[in-house]
C-alpha cells in the first residue's frame, strides 16, 4: 500500500517520477489524506480536491526555490505529505504535532503562514517583487479559492500586481464551486494550452507592436481576442487587472495541468490560471456533501460520518442561534449578518425562517461591519455573528464606521478564547483588549448558556455598539430560560464569599469562561469569587468593595492579559484609591499552539488547579507571607 507515496520524501523525489506514474501517485495520495484525516479529524473536502493540483505544482516548479502560497491554508495536507511530513500526519492538529495550516517554522516549503483568507496574492506579489530586487530568478505562486476571491484584499493585490509587468507571478484560482466558469471541456483545455504557450504570448506582443501605429485596428484585434476568450471563460475581468488569463482547465486532469504550468513557467509578468476542482474528489460521500465533510472529527471512511447523539449540553453557538430566532420572531427589525460562516455561527435555522432578514456577505468582514452600521442608521437592529479571530479583520470599520457614530450594532463574538485544533491563527485571544479601548463600546463575557442568552438580549436593547463574547463548544449544562431578562448595565455578581480571617482573604474577579474554574479554585482556597460579567463598563463599585474587604485580588480571563479585562479592574482599583496586591491571570504574551483546549488552558494555568496554584504561590505560601511582611515594614 502507498508504494509510490512511500518513495516521496520531498518534491525532488516527485520530479524524478515518470509522468505516467503521477496519476497512480495521486490515487495513493488521496487515499492517504482520507485515511489520515479520518484518524485525527481535520479539513477533508478541500484537501481531496487539491491532490492533482498539488502534485502538478511541485512537479513543474522548483520548490522551495519557487514559492507557493496557499490561501486560507486548510487545503495543504497533500502539500505537507509531499514535502517531508508524510510520517507526521498522525499528529496533525494534535498537541505538539504538525499544524493544519502552512507554517514557516515547520518547513521551508511553507513559504508563508496562512489561515485567514484572501492574503495569498499580496504575499506572493511581495515575494515576486522581492525576488526581482534581489536578482533571484524564481516564480511566486498564489493558490486561492473562488470564495476567497470575493474579499477586497484579493482584488487590491490583483490591482497592484497587474502593473508589475516583469514579476514572475502566477495566481491560480481554485474554483471548486463552478461559481465563475462554465463546464470544462476539450475546447477549454485546448484554449488553455494555446493561451499559456510562448507562441501566443509572443504573437500577441508582436501584433500589438505592429498595430500600435493604427489604434483603431489594434482595438478591433483586442475585441476579437476578448470575444474568443469570452465564448468559454469570463477572462475580461482578470485581463483588465493586467493579468494574462488562462483557462479554465480541469484541476483533476494532470495531462492538462502539467503542460499548462510548464508553458506558464516560461512566461514573465502576472499570469492567472483558472482551474476547476471538486471538493471531496474521489470520496463519494464528501463529493455528495462537501459541507458535512469540510472539517469532520474522527470517523470510519467505510461508513462515513454518523449523526452524533444529541449532546446533553447545548453549544454556545446553538444558544446564539436560538436566541436570534426568538428575537426575530418578536421584532421585525432584527437582522442577521454573517461573513460566510452560516453553519459555524449557528444561523442555519435563522436563514430558513427569516430569509429576507438574513445576509451572508461572503468573506468580507470589513463590509459586514459597515453594512451593519448602515442598517442601524435606518432603524434596524443588526446582529453581526462573527468569530473573534475574524473581527480583527474589520477593526477600522468597528472604530470608524460603527463606534465613532455610536450606532446600535450587536456583535455576537463566537470562538472567544482558545479554540483547540485550529491553533494560534484562529484563537480569540485579543477581542477584549482591542475592543475595550474603543469609546462607546459595551462588552460582556458570558459564563454559561443562560447568561449568554440574556446578555445577547441585553445587547439588543442598547443604544450603542455592544459585544457579547462566548467560547466554542458545549456550555456548562445550565438550562436557558425562555423569558428574557435584561442584565443591569455594568453590574457583576458575587458567586461565592470567603470565610477566611483578615490577612488571608482573596477575591477572584472572573470573566466569562473563567468563572467555573475560578469557583473551583475558590472552593479549594476558600476565596471570594465574582462573576464580573461586563468588561466595559467594568463594575468599578464591585471592584472597590472587594478591594476594601479583601487582602488580595486576582483577575482571571480567557484572553490576553495586556490591555484586557484584568487591566480594566486594575484601572478601576487605581481610581478607587484602594491599594491591594493584584495578580492578573490570562493568556500569556505568546501565540498558543494547537491542541486540546482543556490541556492548553491547564498549560496556561487557567484551570481550577492552575488558578489555585498561582494564588497559593503568590499570596498564601510561607514565602509569600515573609515577602508581604517585608513590604508592610518597608
Swiss-Prot record:
UniProt-annotated binding residues for thiamine diphosphate: 74, 115-117, 147-148, 176, 283, 365
Source species, domain of life: Bacteria
Residues bound to Mg(2+): 146, 176
Listed cofactors: Mg(2+); thiamine diphosphate
Keyword Transferase in record: yes
Family: Belongs to the transketolase family. DXPS subfamily.
Description of how the protein assembles with itself and partners: Homodimer.
Name this polypeptide is given: 1-deoxy-D-xylulose-5-phosphate synthase
Amino acid at each position: 500500500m502507498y508504494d509510490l507515496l512511500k518513495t516521496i520524501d520531498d518534491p525532488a523525489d516527485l520530479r524524478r517520477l515518470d509522468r505516467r506514474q503521477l496519476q497512480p501517485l495521486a490515487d495513493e495520495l488521496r487515499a492517504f489524506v482520507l485515511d489520515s484525516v479520518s484518524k485525527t479529524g481535520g479539513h477533508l473536502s478541500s484537501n481531496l480536491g487539491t491532490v492533482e493540483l498539488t502534485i502538478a505544482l511541485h512537479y513543474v516548479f522548483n520548490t522551495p526555490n519557487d514559492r507557493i502560497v496557499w490561501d486560507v491554508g486548510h487545503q495543504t495536507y497533500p502539500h505537507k505529505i509531499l514535502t517531508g511530513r508524510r510520517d507526521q500526519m498522525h499528529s496533525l492538529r494534535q498537541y505538539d504535532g504538525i499544524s493544519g495550516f502552512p507554517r514557516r517554522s515547520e518547513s521551508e516549503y511553507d513559504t508563508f503562514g496562512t489561515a485567514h483568507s484572501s492574503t495569498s496574492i499580496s504575499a506572493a506579489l511581495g515575494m515576486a517583487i522581492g525576488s526581482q530586487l534581489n536578482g533571484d530568478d524564481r516564480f511566486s505562486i498564489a493558490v486561492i479559492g473562488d470564495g476567497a476571491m470575493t474579499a477586497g484584499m484579493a482584488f487590491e493585490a490583483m490591482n497592484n500586481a497587474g502593473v508589475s509587468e516583469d514579476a514572475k507571478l502566477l495566481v491560480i484560482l481554485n474554483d471548486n464551486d463552478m461559481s465563475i466558469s462554465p463546464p470544462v471541456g476539450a475546447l477549454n483545455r485546448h484554449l488553455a494550452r494555446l493561451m499559456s504557450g510562448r507562441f501566443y504570448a509572443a504573437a500577441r506582443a508582436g501584433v500589438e507592436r505592429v498595430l500600435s501605429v493604427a489604434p483603431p485596428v489594434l482595438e478591433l484585434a483586442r475585441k476579437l481576442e476578448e470575444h474568443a476568450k469570452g465564448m468559454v471563460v469570463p477572462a475580461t475581468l482578470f485581463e483588465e487587472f493586467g493579468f494574462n488569463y488562462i483557462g479554465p482547465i480541469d484541476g483533476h486532469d494532470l495531462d492538462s495541468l502539467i503542460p499548462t504550468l510548464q508553458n506558464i513557467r516560461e512566461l514573465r509578468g502576472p499570469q492567472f490560471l483558472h482551474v476547476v476542482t471538486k471538493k471531496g474528489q474521489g470520496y463519494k460521500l464528501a463529493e455528495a456533501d462537501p459541507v458535512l465533510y469540510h472539517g469532520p472529527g474522527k470517523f470510519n471512511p467505510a461508513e462515513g460520518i454518523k449523526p452524533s447523539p444529541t449532546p446533553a449540553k447545548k453549544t454556545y453557538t446553538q444558544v446564539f442561534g436560538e436566541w436570534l430566532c426568538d428575537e426575530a420572531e418578536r421584532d421585525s427589525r432584527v437582522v442577521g449578518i454573517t461573513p460566510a460562516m452560516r453553519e459555524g455561527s449557528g444561523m442555519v435555522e435563522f436563514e430558513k425562517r427569516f430569509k429576507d432578514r438574513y445576509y451572508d456577505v461572503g468573506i468580507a468582514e470589513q463590509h459586514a461591519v459597515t453594512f451593519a452600521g448602515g442598517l442601524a442608521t435606518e432603524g434596524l437592529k443588526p446582529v453581526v455573528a462573527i468569530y473573534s479571530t475574524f473581527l480583527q479583520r474589520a477593526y477600522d470599520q468597528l472604530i470608524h464606521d460603527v463606534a465613532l457614530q455610536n450606532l446600535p450594532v450587536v456583535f455576537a463574538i463566537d470562538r472567544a478564547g482558545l479554540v483547540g485544533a485550529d491553533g494560534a491563527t484562529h484563537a480569540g485571544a485579543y477581542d477584549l483588549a482591542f475592543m475595550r479601548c474603543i469609546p462607546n463600546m459595551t462588552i460582556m463575557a458570558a459564563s454559561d448558556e443562560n447568561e449568554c442568552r440574556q446578555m445577547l438580549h441585553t445587547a439588543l436593547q442598547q443604544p450603542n455598539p455592544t459585544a457579547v463574547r462566548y467560547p466554542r463548544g458545549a456550555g456548562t449544562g445550565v438550562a436557558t430560560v425562555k423569558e428574557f431578562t435584561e442584565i443591569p448595565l455594568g453590574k457583576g455578581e458575587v458567586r461565592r464569599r470567603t470565610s477566611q480571617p483578615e490577612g488571608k482573604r482573596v477575591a477572584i474577579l472572573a470573566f466569562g469562561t473563567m468563572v467555573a474554574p475560578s469557583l473551583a479554585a475558590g472552593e479549594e482556597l476558600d476565596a471570594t469569587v465574582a462573576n464580573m460579567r461586563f468588561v466595559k463598563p467594568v463594575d468599578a463599585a464591585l471592584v472597590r468593595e472587594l478591594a476594601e474587604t479583601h487582602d488580595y485580588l486576582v483577575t482571571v480571563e480567557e484572553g490576553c492579559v495586556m490591555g484586557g479585562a484584568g487591566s480594566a479592574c486594575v484601572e478601576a482599583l487605581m481610581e478607587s484609591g484602594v491599594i491591594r496586591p493584584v495578580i492578573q491571570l490570562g493568556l500569556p504574551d505568546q501565540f498558543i499552539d494547537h491542541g486540546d483546549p482543556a490541556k492548553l488552558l491547564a498549560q496556561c494555568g487557567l484551570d481550577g488547579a492552575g488558578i489555585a496554584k498561582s494564588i497559593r504561590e503568590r499570596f498564601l505560601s510561607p514565602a509569600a507571607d515573609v515577602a508581604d511582611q517585608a513590604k508592610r515594614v518597608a
